């Protein structure tokens, strides 16, 4: 019988120890972003988007969607936007949904503050990562922030001036940043419309976005000709006017009434925009008075609403915390209905100063502030909120129809 070979003794191989992490892996992540408020408060976080420093008024926006539209809305010029919804940037960005009409200028927004770190985009329409997109537009981002606490601070103390800063190495000159925040004069008395407005006339014919075909072009002959004055005009307002059958010509903020009327419009639109209405009104309000006197239908939104009120004899004032979001309830006194609206303003028409003959048509159900006016006996009206819904609900699209009906009536 053959002998069995002796069993081999196999020494078990020692398990390979995982490499010990370098000390730096255990360190607290480096702070690369700061928000420094005018009262000296320093809020630490992580920078993304553009690097550098920018000063502005810190506000909060409660919309859950539409961050790209918000950050390209010229009405946010001079502001640092805090998003209360925690997940921002997760559907990426594209070049189609930009709201700035004047592509030669930036929207003017100074920065954005978010809670969660920005993730890779997951959306079939996305062209670029949110952080990369911010970098190309020169907008500073700050993540890792307790946005609920910051929002409560704004609600209690008002919208503070502040500096948002992003440096990859975390090298900050706190003394300098605090001085910048404390010395910035704020938005009162600031005319920002001139910085975001077109500088020359433009024709517009793009229509609203469709699931099948995207943004389109007006088909057929327009039924009405509208001149839109650009104080910081959003594209979706122009699309809504085009959808309503209007041929739209856009003119700069400093356009004179005589030049506007020489275009022989059926109606005149006064757009949204940033800054203090009294400051922009220095040159705009006298022209608006002439437009109202012409008898042409006039429709205003946001800054256009405020300056129309000034032209009719009312006054405006700075708000404590402003209205920024897509969930603001407004009551329409003409119908008795309540609509959910999109808002973005830090100034408001003082309802106590509305003169005789100017009727309050809409009011905020949050704080009772004025949200709409109409001039008795004339086709002139305006609203404080954004009926074009970008972002936001579409409850107020009827206002564009109302404008068209007034033009129909004026034409006979």
Task: Describe the function of each predicted region.
Residues 34, 73, 329-331, 372:
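Residue-level detector of beta-strand face positions
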Residues 47-48, 86, 344, 375, ...:
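Residue-level structural signal for beta-strand termini and adjacent loop
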């Amino acid at each position: 019988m053959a002998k069995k070979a002796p069993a081999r003794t196999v020494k078990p191989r020692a398990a390979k120890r995982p490499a010990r992490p370098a000390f730096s892996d255990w360190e607290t992540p480096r702070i690369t972003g700061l928000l420094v408020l005018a009262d000296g408060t320093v809020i630490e976080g992580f920078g993304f988007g553009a690097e550098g420093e920018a000063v502005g008024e810190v506000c909060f926006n409660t919309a859950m969607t539409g961050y790209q539209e918000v950050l390209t809305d010229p009405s946010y010029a001079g502001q640092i936007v805090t998003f209360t919804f925690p997940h921002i940037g997760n559907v990426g960005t594209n070049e189609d949904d930009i709201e700035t009409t004047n592509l030669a200028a930036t929207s003017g927004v100074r920065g954005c503050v978010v809670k969660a770190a920005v993730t890779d985009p997951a959306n079939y329409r996305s062209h670029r990562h949110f952080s990369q997109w911010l970098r190309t537009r020169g907008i500073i981002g700050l993540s890792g922030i307790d946005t609920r606490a910051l929002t409560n601070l704004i609600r209690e103390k008002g919208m503070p001036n502040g500096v948002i800063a992003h440096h990859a190495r975390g090298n900050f000159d706190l003394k300098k940043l605090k001085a910048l925040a404390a010395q910035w004069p704020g938005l009162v008395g600031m005319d920002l419309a001139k910085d975001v407005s077109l500088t020359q006339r433009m024709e517009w014919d793009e229509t609203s976005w469709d699931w099948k075909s995207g943004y389109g072009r007006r088909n057929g002959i327009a039924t009405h000709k509208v001149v839109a004055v650009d104080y910081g005009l959003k594209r979706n307002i122009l699309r809504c006017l085009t959808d309503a059958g209007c041929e739209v010509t856009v003119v700069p903020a400093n356009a004179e009434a005589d030049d506007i009327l020489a275009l022989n419009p059926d109606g005149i639109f006064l757009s949204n925009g940033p800054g203090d209405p009294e400051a922009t009104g220095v040159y705009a309000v006298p022209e608006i008075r002439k437009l109202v006197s012409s008898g042409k239908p006039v429709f205003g939104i946001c800054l256009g609403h405020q300056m129309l009120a000034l032209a009719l004899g009312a006054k405006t004032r700075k708000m404590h915390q402003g209205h920024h979001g897509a969930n603001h309830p407004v009551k329409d006194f003409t119908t008795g209905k309540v609509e959910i609206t999109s808002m973005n303003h830090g100034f408001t028409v003082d309802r106590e100063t509305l003169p005789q003959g100017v009727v309050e048509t809409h009011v905020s159900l949050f704080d009772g502030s004025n949200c709409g006016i109409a001039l008795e006996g004339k086709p002139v009206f305006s609203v404080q909120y954004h009926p074009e819904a970008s972002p936001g609900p579409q409850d107020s699209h009827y206002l564009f129809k109302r404008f068209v009906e007034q033009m129909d009536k004026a034409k006979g």
